[in-house]
């Protein structure tokens, strides 16, 4: 029996993690958490009977307490609640599926408590990779990637030494606007943007996929996860989303991980690593697979990717500015307050005005995030 705690159980990754647990009797969900999705939380609590439920919003937490008064699940709230969940002695692995920089402190708390981390929260490594990876090494815990591309690389390098790796090739679908011009992007709507051709994901990450910011964030993460120089990380557009990523070794051999676009596969791989388990669902049928094609990403039109790489090269607090600016810009876009291309402009201007901190600690990272938010709010 493996006990898992989930940060962000009501979102896309969280619900798919619960689906994996639902179909594996030796996975026990001991904790769930959400922002304020009380109805979903109640359903999850009544199905999985966790010991603990953490709700970020205090009013929602009181509502949940009333709803589940007939159960044995303890309800906690706020950051203290998330930290209690992350460090609870009953769990062995912490799934960080929470969106945003709110996930950094609980992830650190989980590491200090000796929990392996099934990492789906991008912000953790993008903004605090220089803090997280040494901490994981110090406490002897594994950072297990849940993102499909990083999981693909993780699987491809299993059993290999880092010195044997020459290049990481991260694949991208290209999103719903692949092939569009800048002029065409001026007219796209929120509804257009949320129609991803291959993956079913949350709203924010779907927008990030359309801007190629998501791929930029994955490059930034890969740098820390696999201890690779940015010059040895390449993005390749693979429109069918069949090859999830590849690794080129120093002898020229390339290992690729292929599969149908199903997020449950990397989730389950992280939960059972280093072992594999049966997973239901579609399988690749090579007799029906007509083509696997590759393209070079259009970095002039889709500026999110080159700006992410620039932020990662500059390092220090610049990745935090990139991430915070994108997060708020996407929120404004989803609220239809700005246009699609304004996302790029907000990121670019935020990075341009920032005076970088070379080696920020966590408090400085969070302060830079708030400063970026305030600057954007004063102008858009």
Question: Can you annotate each of these PLM segments?
Answer:
Residues 1-380:
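Catalytic, metal-anchored helix/loop core of enzyme active sites in primary metabolism
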